[in-house]
Regions:
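Loop-to-transmembrane helix entry
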Residues: 22-32, 230-246, 326-329
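Helix-to-loop junctions at the C-terminal end of transmembrane segments
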Residues: 39-53, 138, 252-264
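Helix-loop boundary and gating motifs at the non-cytosolic
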Residues: 1-34, 202-203, 207, 212-226
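Cytoplasmic helix-loop-helix junction between adjacent transmembrane helices
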Residues: 86-125
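Symmetry-related core transmembrane helices of the 12-TM Major Facilitator Superfamily/SLC fold
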Residues: 145-163, 359-375
């Protein structure tokens, strides 16, 4: 599913670069997709909360993602590429909350932290294998082979989702309403103002937005920087950037699961926010083939920890409200502001100032995340500890 959801993902930049695109327009089409996905995450989360057909949401959006990716083979015109990215992002906005909802519905709140940690470890393993195969196929047969691999993964993901028995999913538990909850009248979902009045949730969303403003563009730009300087094969080097990060993410996601259980989510997220400024510093200083190892290892630490801590913390903060998946979508929307702006900002900065300065600037954006997380520690630490240590 990891490979289906992203389409050709990080290979898009070098695919378009090989066809004469510059970094500015590449960043712009990525941002167009990010904005579309950002606009759809809250409606998608609300729909996931209400629907009893969560499996089919994953199936239909997965098919749309694969078809949208194939548009790029047909044409590399600006409007076609932008449309493909918009469609992929909209589909991806629904897949994330749907998988989280299915997980919560199967294992309930008590088992969510552990199961989500395992899910994310397997998710990163899938990305690792997919990147390795994509790199080899792109090197051996050309970049178009990557599109067909994404389609094959789509078939496998759909088969896996449909193998989950529908009766195994408790759709009330999937939205954060279990029998023992007394927080809401008549066991009904609380209003949307619950999200706006939840201060830890708002701080989390703002910190993630700052983080992704710096993080979103760094992977594709680093790949384009090294490949553009003739220091790496386009397909194989891009695959290496993904594989290094995903290998570290597997370990980081499992570590996050245990650390959250023992110490709460605040420390897990603090470490993840601290990784990005150091990553930007290293990326700006060393645009070399070997630089992929430290730069992408830090990406793996940050993203791997967040992949477990963010959905787990949101599920805890909104437990009993009936708005868990709306909350997931709302936080994804706010962080999506940063993630969607990052490629455009990074792309044009690279075109005007060069790659070195761009990486330093992107890494600097994450300092705002650290400031928020440490500055509001008194509010966040008790909230982040609640529920994380449940067996």
């Amino acid at each position: 599913m990891a490979d289906m959801q992203a389409g050709i993902g990080p290979f898009l930049g070098v695919f378009l670069q090989q066809r004469g695109w510059q970094t500015g327009p590449i960043g712009t089409v990525m941002t167009a997709g990010g904005i579309a996905g950002m606009a759809m995450t809250v409606p998608a989360g609300a729909f996931i909360d209400h629907t009893a057909h969560k499996r089919w949401v994953v199936v239909i959006t997965g098919i749309c993602t694969v078809l949208a990716s194939f548009l790029l083979l047909w044409s590399q015109a600006f409007l076609v590429v932008a449309g493909s990215q918009v469609a992929t992002a909209i589909a991806g906005a629904a897949i994330g909350p749907a998988v989280a909802g299915i997980t919560l519905g199967v294992v309930r709140q008590r088992g969510f932290n552990a199961q989500n940690g395992r899910n994310q470890a397997w998710n990163h393993a899938g990305n690792l294998v997919g990147a390795g195969l994509s790199g080899w196929l792109g090197w051996r047969f050309g970049m178009p082979a990557i599109f067909f691999l994404a389609a094959a993964f789509g078939v496998l993901a759909i088969t896996a989702v449909l193998s989950i028995p529908e009766r195994a999913i408790d759709h009330r538990a999937a939205r954060g309403l279990e029998p023992e909850h007394q927080a809401t009248a008549n066991g009904q979902a609380e209003g949307f103002r619950e999200l706006l009045s939840n201060k830890p949730l708002l701080i989390l969303a703002a910190a993630l937005a700052c983080f992704h403003l710096g993080n979103g563009a760094m992977l594709p730009l680093y790949g384009m920087a090294v490949v553009g300087m003739g220091k790496g094969d386009p397909a194989m080097f891009t695959a290496t950037t993904v594989m290094v990060a995903q290998a570290v993410m597997i370990v980081a996601s499992l570590a996050a699961m245990k650390l959250a259980h023992q110490r709460g989510y605040w420390l897990v997220l603090l470490v993840s926010f601290a990784a990005l400024p150091l990553r930007g510093l290293l990326a700006g200083a060393f645009i070399e083939h070997w630089g992929v190892w430290p730069v992408q290892a830090l990406d793996g630490i940050g993203a791997g920890l967040q992949s477990v801590a963010v959905p787990g913390l949101i599920a805890c903060l909104l437990d009993g409200t009936g708005r868990v998946n709306v909350g997931q979508g709302a936080v994804m929307t706010v962080q999506g502001v940063g993630a969607s702006l990052s490629p455009a900002i990074g792309g044009w900065l690279a075109q005007m100032l060069g790659y070195h300065a761009t990486f330093f600037i992107l890494g600097g954006f994450a300092l705002a995340s650290l400031a928020l997380w440490i500055g509001f520690a008194g509010t966040l630490r008790p909230a982040c500890a609640a529920g994380a240590g449940r067996p």
